[in-house]
């Protein structure tokens, strides 16, 4: 299983799809890092919220404004999601919506992927229920505050550390955690089913444990191109 931990930052919450960075870390189900942490910087092409510009932005403004627009990053982003079995975030609904809106803004095909929300897991876990926010949950579960807060690659890495800590505490791997919390998962293909248990799970693992078989996902043209290039 390949996991894509991701996080996004937005220039202006009133402008749908105003993404200025997408950070990610790719791991296997035992949390061995395969790629990243990396930030994809994007010119949001909009008026900035003053608070974001002054307090949240982790890069020089010149770096972001000289970065390519979202369409130029689209194929790279599509390839990331196509190559992963699941995308994991914290309070992932905001990121899912922003990525969808960014595609709509530039009239690009939506990116299909299966997601898992660690914030929802933390609210349902038996321990550390008093922790709030990514920093609070990481501190509670990992014993130290995350680094590079509000920088999307830093938050993606912190999300990975959080999931790893919860799995180690329960002596399970990532796939088992995802199977245990189907209500914390969803996909961007059928939004109406995002709160329902994924269909492709059955008991076929060792000792009758649940194992997930991911259903084929319809790929965008950009994803098909990325797959073809990878086989060349």
Where are these regions (language model features)?
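Conserved non-catalytic scaffold segment of RNase H-like nuclease domains
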Residues: 2-101, 106, 112, 139-144
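Short, conserved acidic/polar surface loops in the N-terminal third of protein domains
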Residues: 52, 99-101, 125-127, 204-213
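Alpha-helix initiation and N-capping motif
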Residues: 74, 131-134
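Acidic, Mg2+-coordinating catalytic module of metal-dependent nucleases/exonucleases
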Residues: 86-93, 97-103, 133-192
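P-loop/Walker A phosphate-binding loop and immediately adjacent motor/lid segment at beta-alpha junctions
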Residues: 110-114, 170
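Beta-strand segments within the central parallel beta-sheet cores of soluble alpha/beta enzyme folds
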Residues: 114-117, 178-179
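Short alpha-helix plus adjacent loop in nuclease-associated cores
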Residues: 116-132
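Acidic two-metal-ion nuclease catalytic site recognized across multiple nuclease folds
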Residues: 160-232
């Amino acid at each position: 299983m390949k996991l894509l931990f991701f996080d996004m930052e937005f220039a202006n919450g009133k402008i749908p799809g105003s993404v200025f960075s997408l950070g990610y870390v790719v791991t296997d189900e035992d949390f061995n890092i395969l790629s990243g942490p990396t930030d994809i910087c994007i010119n949001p092409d909009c008026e900035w919220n003053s608070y974001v510009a002054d307090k949240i932005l982790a890069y020089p403004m010149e770096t972001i404004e000289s970065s390519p627009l979202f369409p130029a990053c689209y194929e790279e982003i599509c390839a990331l999601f196509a190559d992963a079995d699941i995308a994991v975030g914290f309070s992932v609904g905001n990121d899912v919506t922003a990525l969808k809106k960014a595609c709509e803004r530039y009239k690009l095909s939506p990116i299909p992927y299966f997601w898992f929300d660690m914030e929802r897991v933390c609210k349902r876990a038996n321990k550390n229920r008093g922790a709030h926010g990514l920093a609070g949950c990481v501190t509670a579960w990992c014993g130290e505050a995350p680094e590079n807060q509000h920088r999307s690659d830093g938050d993606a890495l912190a999300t990975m550390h959080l999931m790893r800590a919860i799995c180690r505490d329960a002596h399970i791997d990532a796939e088992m955690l995802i199977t245990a919390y189907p209500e914390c998962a969803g996909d961007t293909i059928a939004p109406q089913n995002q709160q329902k248990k994924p269909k492709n799970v059955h008991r076929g693992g060792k000792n009758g444990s649940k194992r997930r078989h991911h259903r084929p996902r319809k790929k965008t043209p950009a994803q098909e191109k990325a797959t073809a290039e990878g086989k060349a």
